[in-house]
Every structure is written in C-alpha cells, then in structure tokens.
C-alpha cells in the first residue's frame, strides 16, 4: 500500500507523550531552554520531554546544535497535532563571561491539525461482539486536535481486545493515519478483520500434584468449548494460587497449540510444604501485651482437607482453638469447618470460662455476600463481681451474612464491610435459656489525597429473652476500647447493678467516626 509523503513523515518517532500536572514557562535542559508561547501546557510538557540535556558546549557548538534542537521541538509538537510551529532561537551570553552560553528556543505553535474523518470498521465476528465494541476508545473524534497518542491507543486497543477475547487470527487490512499539514486535516482509517473467535478446550492437570482431579476440576469455572477470554485463564490461575495448596501455578493456554480453533488448557502445579507454624508478640491498648501462635496443615489428604490450631495469650484473655476444614464446590469460597475452643477471660467485673464446639458452613452467594450457617454448643462458667459462679449450656444455631468491598486486600484506601448475625437457643433444644441474639455491624474507610483517612463504625445489637439473668456474658453487650468507643477501657461500658458492677446490656448501639493522617509511609 502506497502512502502519501506527508503520511510517511508523520509516522516517524512521534508517539511519546509525557504529561505532567504542573507547567512551567520554559524548560532548561543544561544549556538549552524552550518556551511555548500561549496557554499550551501539554505542548510545553511534551517539548520538555523531548529535549535532550546538553552541557559543555561552546557558543559555536550551540549554533551547530540549533537544527537538532529545533527538530526535537518539532517532533514534540507534531505528536500533539501542531505541524507548523514557528521556532525562533538565540544564543544568550553570560554576563561577564561567567558560565556557559545558553541556547534559547521560543515557539509559536501555529494552527493545529484537526481530525477530519474517522473510519473504524471491525469486520468478522468481532464486529457483532458487544464485549469487543464496548471497550473501543471514543477518542479521537472528528473535530479534535490530532493527538498521535490517542490514535496509537485506539489502534493498540483493537489489537489488545482481539488477544484478550480470543480473536487470534485478527489483522488490520487498513491502518492509516493520513495527515495533510497544508489543509490542517487528518484522516483516520482502521479496518480490522477479526477472524473466528477461538474456544477453550478441556483442562488437563499434569500429574504429580498429589490431589484428586475431582477437587482440581472444581477450580475450573468455564465450560469446555466455551469462547476464549483471557480473564477465564487469569481467574483459574489466581484461584489455584490463592487456594493455599500450591507454591507455584502455571496455566498454559497458548493459541499456537490450538486444533480447529480449540485451545487445550494445561496446568502444572507444585505443591507447597504441607505444614507451617507462625507466632508473634504484640501490644494493643485493649488487652496490653499479647502472644499469638498458630499451626496449620494446609492439606492432609488428596481431597484437600486441612486443619489447624491457634492460641492467643494476654493478661485479660487466654484462648486456644482447633479446627478441621473440608472444601466444597466451589472450593475458592465454600467450605465446612468443624471447630472446638476454650477461652478464659477476666475483664473488669466479669470472669468467664467458655468452651465451644461447633460447625460452620460457608457459602458465597451470586451477589457476593458470604453466607455462614452454624451450629455451636457452648458451656460457659461465669461470675459478675463478687457474686456466685453461674453456668449455662446452650445449643446455638445461627445464620450470618457478610460483605467486604475494598480496593486492595492488603492496604485498602477505600472500602466497606457489612455483617449481620442471628443466633438463638431454646430450652426444648438442649439449652438452659430461651435466647434470640442479633448483631449487625458496618465499617467504612475512605482516603482523601493519599494521607487523609476517614474511618466510620456502627454496631447495633439486641438480645430477646424471657429471663435476662440466664444470658451468659458472651451473649450480652459491652462497649469500650479501640474498636468500639475510644477513651474507655476494653468492654468496660455496660449497665451496672446497685453495687456498680457491670452486667452487660440487652441492647447495643455504638457509632464512631475517626480521622487519621499518615505522616510517613
């Protein structure tokens, strides 16, 4: 295909655009400065980006460099649609012969080149694919000042979409940006033939991983024979990596291995060490110094079962727990966990020893909410103040929902967490009391200008019972502490009896808002 001379010249070396948020009237690159007249911050920035730093040149050397410097400025302005700048220059001699001479360039941008026509045609099956057309850039549009960066982005986006959606045989039939500086006009023509969309074949796991194939197949969320999408491959790799079973995951779905437009998916897995131990020492204003430790067996059989033990020791609270977990389908989100634990706690006027044995079923709904159905048997011995020791035995079925949305799993700058939990017990079902317990909470985080963080919390709860004195401390409400009401001791706020002993509340309503400023990262 033959292109006019002005098109060939415009394709040379134009296409870097470095845009800064602050502008300056002139750029000083060693012995060379450039100033774009008028209110053209983008042109000024691009001229600065293209200008080479020159040092150690004599006055004669600077004169020889003028044509090179003017060429750099012209290239920078062409990239943003200004093909006919007027560039004046002068050599500035230092006063008293102190310091080197300076080459000063002054630029009048002139009249810009405008987009006169835009023809973008996607031929083949991709032309009728909403997923392809939805993400095509709208820029540049007819009437815009020509921006080579936008043209390149449009062209590159078409190629990227084809690769992402599986149109691997796609190619440009016409790819032309015709610029006529005399008419100050540019014509864009992009004709892309997509070819047929590839499909994904069967997933094969290379032997040696030690797991049941039936378990691994539950990580595959796409159907064999379905259309290719790179996100499907990325999700499979991510889910396997985040499962906790493997130290490395390699998912191969290269188009070159396709047969008849169907790409086989081959997965190579390296199993992680089965066990890990972690421990740590910390301090919080709620419980003071504390010691934490956990032991975890990440997989104990080919079905992917796992188990672990955890403990936390501090002056007011000591606990230990063990658990055993079975993955369900899909194993990324769904599981059944059996657990048992013992906790001893002494805070202000309340002493408690709590033994818990139970089961949890976790299931993620299509809406993104995590649903948890549980049933726990709890035996608690407790005492308020100097009173006598009481004991409760409760069988507590429960249902909970939680939702977490955040822009990062590790250090979020904004997001929220919502939860609702309902549990209950009845004397007719192996329990010492009739209880309905409801607790809802909401947390929100929002960051402004990187360093200013706003954190809000809200907790609402209630206990319905015909005899509140039978409700153990673990099901009553207390407030106070870093995660509740700052300025008060941990769980020291509650209704009191005539002797000033905190008894815990039947209802809870706690809200707070915090402002945090980050001085250094």
Language model: regions and residue ranges:
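Outer-membrane beta-barrel strand-turn architecture
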Residues: 271-273, 299-301, 328-330, 363-367, ...
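Periplasmic polypeptide-binding modules associated with outer-membrane biogenesis and secretion
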Residues: 29-42, 52-285, 294, 308-326, ...
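C-terminal outer-membrane beta-barrel translocator/porin domains of Gram-negative envelope proteins
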Residues: 242, 390, 394-521
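Outer-envelope beta-barrel architecture signal
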Residues: 261-263, 273-277, 289, 303-307, ...
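Bacterial N-terminal signal peptides that target proteins for export
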Residues: 2-15
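Transmembrane beta-strand segments that form the barrel wall of outer-membrane beta-barrel proteins
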Residues: 220, 275-285, 293, 297-299, ...
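Transmembrane beta-barrel wall of Gram-negative outer-membrane proteins
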Residues: 320-393, 397-399
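Solvent-exposed loop/turn segments connecting transmembrane beta-strands
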Residues: 283-290, 311-320, 345-354, 384-391, ...
């Amino acid at each position: 295909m033959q292109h006019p001379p002005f098109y060939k010249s415009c394709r040379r070396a134009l296409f870097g655009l470095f845009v800064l948020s602050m502008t300056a009237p002139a750029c000083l690159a060693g012995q060379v400065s450039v100033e774009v007249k008028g209110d053209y911050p983008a042109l000024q920035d691009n001229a600065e980006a293209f200008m080479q730093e020159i040092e150690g040149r004599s006055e004669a050397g600077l004169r020889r460099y003028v044509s090179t410097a003017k060429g750099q400025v012209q290239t920078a302005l062409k990239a943003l649609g200004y093909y006919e700048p007027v560039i004046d220059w002068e050599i500035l001699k230092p006063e008293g012969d102190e310091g080197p001479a300076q080459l000063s360039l002054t630029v009048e941008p002139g009249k810009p080149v405008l987009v006169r026509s835009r023809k973008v045609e996607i031929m083949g099956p991709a032309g009728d694919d909403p997923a392809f057309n939805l993400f095509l850039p709208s820029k540049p549009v007819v009437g815009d000042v020509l921006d080579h960066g936008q043209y390149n982005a449009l062209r590159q986006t078409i190629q990227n979409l084809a690769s992402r959606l599986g149109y691997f045989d796609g190619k440009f039939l016409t790819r032309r940006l015709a610029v006529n500086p005399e008419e100050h006009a540019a014509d864009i023509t992009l004709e892309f033939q997509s070819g047929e969309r590839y499909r994904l074949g069967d997933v094969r796991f290379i032997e040696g991983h030690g797991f049941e194939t039936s378990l691994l197949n539950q990580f595959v969320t796409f159907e064999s024979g379905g259309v290719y999408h790179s996100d499907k491959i990325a999700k499979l790799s991510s889910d396997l990596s985040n499962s906790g079973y493997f130290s490395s995951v390699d998912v191969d779905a290269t188009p070159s291995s396709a047969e008849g437009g169907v790409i086989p998916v081959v997965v190579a897995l390296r199993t992680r060490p089965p066990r890990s131990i972690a421990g740590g020492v910390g301090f919080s204003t709620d419980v003071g110094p504390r010691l934490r430790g956990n032991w975890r067996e990440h997989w104990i059989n080919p079905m992917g079962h796992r188990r672990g033990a955890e403990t936390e020791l501090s002056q007011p609270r000591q606990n230990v727990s063990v658990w055993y977990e079975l993955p369900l389908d899909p194993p990324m989100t769904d599981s059944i966990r059996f657990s048992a634990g013992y906790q001893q706690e002494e805070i202000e006027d309340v002493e408690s020893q709590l033994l818990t044995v139970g089961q949890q079923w976790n299931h993620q709904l299509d809406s993104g909410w995590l649903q948890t159905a549980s049933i726990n048997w709890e035996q608690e011995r407790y005492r308020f103040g100097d009173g006598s020791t009481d004991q409760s035995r409760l069988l507590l079925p429960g249902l909970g929902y939680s939702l977490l949305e955040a822009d990062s799993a590790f250090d979020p700058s904004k997001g929220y967490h919502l939860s609702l939990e309902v549990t209950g017990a009845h004397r007719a079902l192996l329990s010492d009391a009739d209880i309905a317990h409801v607790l809802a909470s909401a947390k929100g985080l929002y960051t402004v200008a990187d360093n200013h963080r706003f954190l809000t919390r809200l907790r609402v709860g209630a206990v319905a019972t015909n005899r509140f004195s039978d409700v153990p401390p673990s099901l009553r409400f207390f407030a106070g502490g870093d995660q509740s009401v700052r300025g008060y001791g941990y769980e020291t706020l509650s209704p009191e009896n005539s002797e000033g002993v905190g008894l815990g509340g039947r209802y809870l309503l706690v809200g707070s808002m915090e402002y945090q400023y980050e001085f250094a990262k």
